[in-house]
Structure formats: structure tokens, C-alpha cells
Amino acid sequence: MVIVKKISAIEVLDSRGNPTIKTKVELCDGSIGEAIVPSGASTGKRERLELRDGGEAFGGKGVLKAIKNVNSMIAEEICGKDAYNQKAIDDAMLALDGTDNYSRIGANAVLGVSMAVARAAANSLNIPLYRYLGGANACTLPVPMFNIINGGAHANNSVDFQEFMIMPFGFSKFSNALRAATEVYQTLKKILNDLGHSTAVGDEGGF
């Protein structure tokens, strides 16, 4: 058992220049875990609620309300709990919120704490995060996915589909899969240039 000692959060900017939450969790043995919450450009109707501030700052996309929830009610609930019991941590935050979609304290507030606790626990055990989450038998990394053409809400063009993605299967190392995808991306760029098409990138980095 290792106890969660301190939880704090600050506002940072994501890759699109929009505010998001960076959460830091410190355990009693000195281990630290940090996490920055991702955010999509489009939102599905079943997605959990990101708590945003509204108002004028950052076009209403500020996350100071969610940060306040992390630094107050979530910290009060989670500090003192066993960081090695991830399910108990997550269940405690779900119970604290009391809604089906985290509309009270914000899914962005909850996700940052959950990820940071997991990373702190992995660091406490001096093992990689994938090993901590996957257990002793975790030996296969997921196949990476790469967005190479953007449309829909992710680009200012007439393409109906939002994402065209590739998955480089069959490589023994992640680095080789990454290289293969990069080569496909650069080859596609050359083909588009040769055909006189735009190679400006969309919201997800695809053409």
C-alpha cells in the first residue's frame, strides 16, 4: 500500500491552443505522477462531460472550474487512499460526482486525476505504466494509428469523412511501425503535391 499524499492541478494549453488540465499526484513515498487531459475537436453524444468555464476567456473554453474541483473536493476525497487500488480511486470519483456523465465535477477533472494516480503508482513500483496496468503478462504494445487525411469537423474542406487512418501491422518494434507510418505520410504528401492538391494540414495533422 502507498498512500496518495497530495493532488494539484493547473491550466495548460493543448496542441490546439485550447485550455486543458495538467494534474500532479504525489504519494507518501515521494513518487510523483503527472497527466495532461486530452480533448477532442468533436464530441460524441455519449461522451462524458468536459467541464468548461464559459465566459469570455479562451472563448469560454477555460477549465478553472474543473481545476477548482480537482484541488478541492477531489483532493479531499482521494488523498489518504491507496494509490495501488486504481479501481477504488476511480469508483470514489464516480460516487463523488453522482451523475452518469460526470457533469458535476467534470470528466476532464476525473480523467487527469485517474491517469496521474496510475503513473504515480507505476513510478512507486519502478515499472513502466503499461506493465503496471497490464500486469506481468503485458508484453504486446497496441498497434499505433495515424491520421493521414482530415475531413468533417477536423478540416476546412469538403471531405465528408472526418478521419482516414492507417495502422502499420506486423512490425516487431514500435519504432519500426512509427517509421513505416511516417514514410507513408511523407509519400502521400509527395503524391498530393505532384497532383497539385493542397498539403495544408487539418485539426489532427492529416492532409
From Swiss-Prot:
Q: In which pathway does it act?
A: Carbohydrate degradation; glycolysis; pyruvate from D-glyceraldehyde 3-phosphate: step 4/5
Q: Give the catalysed reaction(s), semicolon-separated.
A: (2R)-2-phosphoglycerate = phosphoenolpyruvate + H2O
Query: Could you name the domain of life of the organism this protein comes from?
Result: Bacteria
Active site per database record: E204 (proton donor)
Q: Which residues bind (2R)-2-phosphoglycerate?
A: Q162
The alphabetized UniProt keywords are:
Cytoplasm, Glycolysis, Lyase, Magnesium, Metal-binding, Secreted
The record's Gene Ontology biological-process terms are:
glycolytic process
Sorted alphabetically, which Gene3D superfamilies does this protein's record hold? Answer: Enolase-like C-terminal domain, Enolase-like, N-terminal domain
Does the record carry 4Fe-4S as a key word?
Answer: no
Q: Where in the cell is it found?
A: Cytoplasm; Secreted; Cell surface
Q: Quote the EC number.
A: 4.2.1.11
Q: Cellular component terms, GO, for this chain's entry?
A: cell surface; extracellular region; phosphopyruvate hydratase complex
Q: What's an example of a GO molecular-function annotation for this chain?
A: magnesium ion binding
Q: Which PANTHER family match?
A: ENOLASE (PTHR11902:SF1)
Function in brief? Catalyzes the reversible conversion of 2-phosphoglycerate (2-PG) into phosphoenolpyruvate (PEP). It is essential for the degradation of carbohydrates via glycolysis.
Which family does the similarity line name?
Belongs to the enolase family.
Q: What's this protein's name? A: Enolase
Native species: Campylobacter fetus
The uppermost taxa in this organism's lineage are: Bacteria, Pseudomonadati, Campylobacterota, Epsilonproteobacteria, Campylobacterales
Which gene specifies this protein's sequence?
A: eno
